[in-house]
Amino acid sequence: MDRYFFLQDATTVAKLLLGNLLIRKIDKEEIVTRIVETEAYMGITDSACHSYGGKITNRTSAMYRIGGYSYVYIIYGMHYMFNVVTADKNNPQAVLIRSVEPISPLLGEKSILTNGPGKLTKFLNIDLTFNKVDLIGNNELFLQRGLNLDFNIVCSKRININYAQESDINKLWRFYIKDNKFVSRR
């Protein structure tokens, strides 16, 4: 996937990432997963987004990079969240990867290991060392075009954003592959 792909807005990229591969290389082994659920965070005008109002902190500074970088942060002191930065530099939008489907051989039907944003980062061993990483050309964590992009997409409200303004809570900016058993919530 090239830089241009990630320069689009977060809602566009969130839909386009579905069905594509998130690959983590540990030692010499590749763990291949298929992205099945995402959420878009639209930057300074989205009260559910960490960069709402133009907020820049050490944590949110990753969102101000050019599209194609990672934004990893920790919640509840124990769960890492993996996001893909989108749009132009200083237009802080991102896509949260909520769930993935394991594809690598020997991984089997372990949906309980990857059916949520904290679970997938644990499964793929993604932590803060992967914050602000350029996902284009990286050989430890990267995205790749999927082979089967023929599926229906469900749009729904984002999860756990009750702190946001009602208008943002009601936006249908969560996307997932219909009938995929690895989705965190239906």
Curated annotation (Swiss-Prot):
Highest taxon in the source lineage: Bacteria
Matches recorded under SUPFAM superfamilies: FMT C-terminal domain-like (SSF50486)
Classification via Gene3D superfamilies: Methylpurine-DNA glycosylase (MPG)
Enzyme Commission number, as recorded: 3.2.2.-
Keyword Hydrolase: yes
Gene Ontology terms for molecular function: alkylbase DNA N-glycosylase activity; DNA binding
InterPro entries: Formyl_transferase-like_C_sf (IPR011034), MPG (IPR003180), MPG_sf (IPR036995)
Protein family: Belongs to the DNA glycosylase MPG family.
Protein's name in the database: Putative 3-methyladenine DNA glycosylase
Top-level taxonomy: Bacteria, Pseudomonadati, Spirochaetota, Spirochaetia, Spirochaetales
